[in-house]
């Protein structure tokens, strides 16, 4: 076997890149340290210098995976150059698309099997999950502007997140035949979420046509 000349400083990144490429097409359970060694032309002992075990590797994948997930969601939610309703719509739709495009990684991040590893890194209970913090902050922004009902922002964010997780799971696990209509289902779900969250004192202002068709008695 021809061994590649990897620098010590980038070998860990190479292992992670191979791991992410692998789980894009296959389940994390099928990833072995031997696969990493073969792909990089290194020995398994080289892997153990960076990861003490497969669980340690998976824990790092979870940590990096959540960072990637957050980069896909938070900038949209926190972009105050866009109106709040559009931010909600685009970010939450982005959540669905990210799950659909990364089903194995999504299951790894949010599934039950590796929950102990995940919970050793972050939790929505202590604000260490950055994407959830951004969602809750956007809910609070909406409350302060009078758009969203002034209720428990944590519970409101949980309702949004749970709805997104439910639809995402149905899509990626083919539990229901929704592949052809998931965008329509998402729009219907978004309208239902808005109906429960939006203050009755405002009319929604949005660049999204179907949102503007939700009538409220007063122009914001």
Predicted regions and their residues:
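Hydrophobic/aromatic residues within well-ordered alpha-helical segments
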Residues: 54, 61, 65-69, 91, ...
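Helix-turn-helix
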Residues: 14, 25-56, 60
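Generic hydrophobic, amphipathic alpha-helix propensity
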Residues: 11-20, 36, 61-65, 69, ...
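Amphipathic alpha-helical linker/stalk segments
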Residues: 3, 63-88, 120, 125-131, ...
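Short secondary-structure transition hinges
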Residues: 104-137, 176-179
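Hydrophobic alpha-helical connector segments
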Residues: 60, 74-105, 160, 209-210
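Hydrophobic/aromatic-rich alpha-helical bundle segments in the mid-to-C-terminal region
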Residues: 121, 143-191, 200-220
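Alpha-helical DNA-contacting segments of helix-turn-helix folds
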Residues: 23, 58-65, 109, 117
């Amino acid at each position: 076997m021809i061994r590649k000349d990897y620098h010590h400083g980038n070998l860990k990144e190479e292992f992670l890149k191979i791991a992410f490429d692998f789980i894009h097409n296959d389940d994390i359970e099928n990833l072995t340290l031997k696969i990493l060694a073969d792909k990089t032309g290194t020995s398994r002992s080289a892997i153990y210098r960076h990861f003490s075990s497969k669980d340690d590797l998976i824990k790092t994948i979870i940590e990096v995976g959540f960072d990637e997930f957050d980069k896909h969601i938070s900038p949209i939610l926190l972009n105050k150059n866009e109106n709040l309703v559009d931010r909600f719509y685009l970010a939450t739709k982005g959540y669905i698309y990210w799950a659909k495009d990364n089903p194995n990684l999504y299951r790894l991040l949010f599934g039950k099997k590796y929950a102990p590893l995940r919970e050793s890194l972050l939790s929505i209970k202590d604000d260490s999950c950055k994407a959830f913090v951004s969602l809750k902050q956007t809910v609070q922004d909406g409350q302060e502007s009078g758009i969203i009902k002034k209720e428990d922002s944590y519970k409101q964010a949980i309702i949004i997140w749970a709805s997104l997780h439910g639809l995402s799971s149905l899509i990626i696990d083919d539990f229901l035949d929704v592949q052809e209509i998931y965008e329509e289902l998402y729009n219907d779900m978004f309208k239902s979420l808005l109906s429960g969250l939006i203050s009755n004192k405002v009319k929604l202002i949005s660049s999204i046509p179907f949102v503007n068709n939700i009538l409220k008695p007063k122009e914001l």
